[in-house]
Amino acid sequence: MVDVNRFKSMQITLASPSKVRSWSYGEVKKPETINYRTLKPEREGLFDEVIFGPTKDWECACGKYKRIRYKGIVCDRCGVEVTRAKVRRERMGHIELKAPVSHIWYFKGIPSRMGLTLDMSPRALEEVIYFAAYVVIDPMDTPLEPKSLLTEREYREKVQEYGYGSFIAKMGAEAIQDLLKRVDLPAEIAELKEELKTATGQKRIKAVRRLDVLDAFNKSGNKPEWMVLNILPVIPPDLRPMVQLDGGRFAASDLNDLYRRVINRNNRLARLLELNAPGIIVQNEKRMLQEAVDALIDNGRRGRPITGPGSRPLKSLSHMLKGKQGRFRQNLLGKRVDFSGRSVIAVGPTLKMYQCGVPREMAIELFKPFVMREIVAKEYAGNVKAAKRMVERGDERIWDILEEVIKEHPVLLNRAPTLHRLGIQAFEPVLIDGKALRLHPLVCEAYNADFDGDQMAIHVPLSEEAQAEARLLMLAAEHILNPKDGKPVVTPSQDMVLGNYYLTMEDAGREGEGMIFKDIDEAVMAYQNGYAHLHSRVGIAVDSMPNKPWKDSQRHKIMVTTVGKILFNAIMPEDLPYLQEPNNANLTEGTPDKYFLEAGQDIQEVIDNLPINVPFKKKNLGNIIAETFKRFRTTETSAFLDRLKDLGYYHSTLAGLTVGIADIPVIDNKAEIIEAAHHRVEDINKAFRRGLMTEDDRYIAVTTTWREAKEALEKRLIETQDPKNPIVMMMDSGARGNISNFSQLAGMRGLMAAPNGRIMELPILSNFREGLSVLEMFFSTHGARKGMTDTALKTADSGYLTRRLVDVAQDVIIREDDCGTDRGLVIRAITDGKEVTETLEERLQGRYTRKSVKHPETGEVLIGADQLISEDMARKIVEAGVEEVTIRSVFTCATRHGVCRHCYGINLATGDAVEVGEAVGTIAAQSIGEPGTQLTMRTFHTGGVASNTDITQGLPRIQEIFEARNPKGEAVITEVKGKVVDIEEDASTRTKKVYVEGKTGNGEYVVPFTARMKVEIGDEVNRGAALTEGSIQPKRLLEVRDTLSVETYLLAEVQKVYRSQGVEIGDKHVEVMVRQMLRKVRVMDPGDTDLLPGTLMDISDFTDANKEIVISGGIPATSRPVLMGITKASLETNSFLSAASFQETTRVLTDAAIRGKKDHLLGLKENVIIGKIIPAGTGMARYRNIEPQAINEVEIIEETEQAEETVVTEAE
């Protein structure tokens, strides 16, 4: 077998007949498979041992030679070689076809490769191949046209007219093979190149297509006649197995049936030819052979598929590769793995951040080999077999050994669907009783897991390297930040938030207010003995916390705080300031001075003058975690998170906050508000009946009235709410629920959508506390059901989007430190009208500058060129009033097949500069795809009558952008730079005309009457600026402007959709994806290069070709950038393995074979497919060529049989 790690690239070509013969170990002549009596393979049949090898290891068919010592001998009785049975997965056979047969991929694909090569239409080809017409191969001296078709009747007439043998015309694949042999590639190519100089329109398109195929044949060394088969390879029998079921029946792969049909028809044809049967019978048999081979290669591609029992179409060779169940996606890209298990998950509140609970029974099974090794090492058992028995019997001593074995041996936990890289993390196992895996509550958010019956899978990394990588790179305690936005992903939720919220509440006049304590212990003791309440404001000596960063003026004083806050601050990292107020100033600058007593001041007086602070909410906790991470990095942060979790759980348990129906408040003036709304609606309807308003106006007025009534109730609720009400506390702290849930419980449910999407005029006046009437309940059900179905559809849609994104960007890896480009991207805040979608500060963080940034007023250099912009620096730049900065960007990076470190900036998941080898493409795809499920599915109508354009938003808009489709509600853009001089309205055609006057020319644009204008008379506009509201068509923008403008536009559009839904995604992720959509150019004029006009190629390949020509003094080629949707871009990738495993497998492979394509294995997918280590992370060449230093030899235990086999494999 080939050693996977040795080769650099992989090529696919057409197989010549001699190549097929060289693969084959013999001809399959009979359709028989297995003898049903002896269950032995039949001679010369599809499972013949002589051809394919023995069915049992080291044993010939007749049993004369058994045992390994006869290795390599061919038995003189039965002719079977004595070898491993595994060769039946490798050895191929062949069938000598008695008539040539066309290969359906090349004849039927779109475009038909045979048709283009011969310049014949697919219809004509089909008639010839399936014996419906003759084709003239050589007219000789007759006036017939070469390649013209003749029907049976016309053929006979022409033979009578010109005489037998005066011209050559044939039928079937044989005729096509003759024509293909006669194609003179160099001459045809030269002719087409001449034609291209003058051709236009359809003719030109066809010529470019033909030239493409002919040039591919010419360059690859494939011969066109190889598209017609004279010999058919038979794949190894173990790849199309036959298995005996209970009850003596057999289950066989469909391929065997398909091969049997081919062999039967081929043998019958041979017999007919021997007997000199009449031509029509032979023709019919040849046609049937052709159809049998078609079905074997791609069943159902032409005509009706051949069916098996129960009219089920048989699975042909093409179906074995295609789709989710095909070879690529089922077996090569995702395999099942051993040393894995799955179970339901339960919460493990006592676990540390890096631990997970593994049930004993599961652990002993997963770590069995490790335990067995230890048993033998400790001499509890003499050999491995005895150790295995010991484990299986459940000997008492195995549990202690298991404890030792799992120490320091991380395991991986994975929850499906794995939407981003945080869906698989490593933990240190802790043995537990029971049968459920225990999961740390803080990692639930990353996994999107809850404990309502979710299951998770567990995997054991086996090798030392795998364990090291799991520990260093995948340990859950290391994954504090979310790779999509660099914000903490492990923020506490629910009980933890509620506990800390309750703990940090302040209350006036509670027991113990004004007490002064000398240190923390004293305060805790007073609280535990009931002298002071958690929420009472008390004094504490600052000197009892000497390690906090106090100002000098604050030391040696008494500070006013609450007992709860003393406990809360006790778990904080020591270098963080003492937190009194939930705001950033306290967190970053220190504790405010107003909480400290001056000498001789009365503490009660100070307390009375201080405002009551609000407690710490979920958002504040998130900020504290982010600040802790920024200062102390992962180790300290994960320890702090565990303390925060424990404190939260403890105090939410003590507080005992519960919800009962009595906790839902009653709004005193609800009846009045609703009464007023009823009167208003009545007035509106009267006005409508009098004809004072249109139906649309009436509808809008009524729905607005009810909306306002609901808002009035909500406002009243908020005004009258009691901060000590448990529901309010849960909502306010961010533990669970929001104001809209609250207002449905206590206010009114409000307006509902009808099944057609229109809002119903009848609102639901009741709330959940009062209960709904039957009719109201019925109105509610539609919304609830639609929510469920929407979610289900959205999940599938979002998953497919992620798959396409991953596919297009999987080969984008950080390849070098600095690409040395002199280009950059000018960035400013992204705005949508007046609203700021993304601030400049957010966009600057973690990027490298391209030019130095100067203070706009003083001219002082704030930061030099090519420097990393930190969070503080970004704030400083924005505060200085700088509005735009030129940064290094993925868009302008010059690295081939990837990005360099400087153009990418920091790795958002670690907060440090990105490492070489980071698979940033995959991370970008996951970061954009993972929040996809949070986006809405709807197409919104913009406010009633005002406009008739539907603006697509949410997931459909994201798909529209990434697939580069023409948007709905397209904006009109200007092609000239200049000034808007006039806007005319034309009532007769219901349009407006916009006139733009520029230096280079004038433009006149017709826009629909109803479109909202974005410009006014006198406005200056740039090329590509939108004149009306709506989305710009990116392909149109690319024609008018340059690549960078399109990239910037797409980036801003994606951010608008995500930010409007409250999802933050780092710019760099979108940049990586958009760059992949603009990697290709189309050659317009080849100049002196040997490129073909109209070819699509990679920008870097194009510049390379031009460099060579310019050096030798020739004319360079010109090209035009092409914008591709992500699906198209994935299929156009340089790697045929990656493209074939994505979509349209047969089309990709057909094309690659004709071109003799080489896959240089640069991306991740192609390496996974062939089983090579991926060239990212530790798999990169620069990290792999390190010589390991052996410290001490590892002893290997071998049993005699194993030893025997080892010797053999070495001898091989």
From Swiss-Prot:
Residues annotated to bind Zn(2+) 2: 819, 893, 900, 903
EC number: 2.7.7.6
A GO CC annotation given for this chain: DNA-directed RNA polymerase complex
Any GO MF annotation of the entry: DNA-directed RNA polymerase activity
Protein name, as recorded: DNA-directed RNA polymerase subunit beta'
Gene Ontology BP terms: DNA-templated transcription
Alphabetically ordered keywords of this record: DNA-directed RNA polymerase, Magnesium, Metal-binding, Nucleotidyltransferase, Transcription, Transferase, Zinc
Organism, as annotated: Streptococcus uberis (strain ATCC BAA-854 / 0140J)
Gene: rpoC
Reaction catalysis annotation: RNA(n) + a ribonucleoside 5'-triphosphate = RNA(n+1) + diphosphate
Cofactors demanded by this protein: Mg(2+); Zn(2+)
